[in-house]
Amino acid sequence: MPQVFKIGSFWVYFWANENKPLEPVHVHAAKGKPTANATKFWITRSGKTLLANNNSDYSAKMLNYLSKAIEANKDIIIEKWLEFFGEINYYC
């Protein structure tokens, strides 16, 4: 499971097994350690985020904080996604 970066006590990462065909580029965010019930954000072609799910039940304030941090690091996310999976597509 590639860990892309850390924001305070939150890990932003993607799973090594992201299904076949490969899902569009996205990351999971979890406090403490990666978990299967993490919150998921799609990365759009324009570099913005879309909330795919909030399985971690974070507050709107926390979701906004995570979304902004993910958008600020979109280039790193996309680079690491391509390095790991060798291909990329976008949700929209």
Where does each model-flagged region fall?
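Low-complexity, intrinsically disordered short peptide segments enriched in small/polar/basic residues
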Residues: 1, 40, 74-75
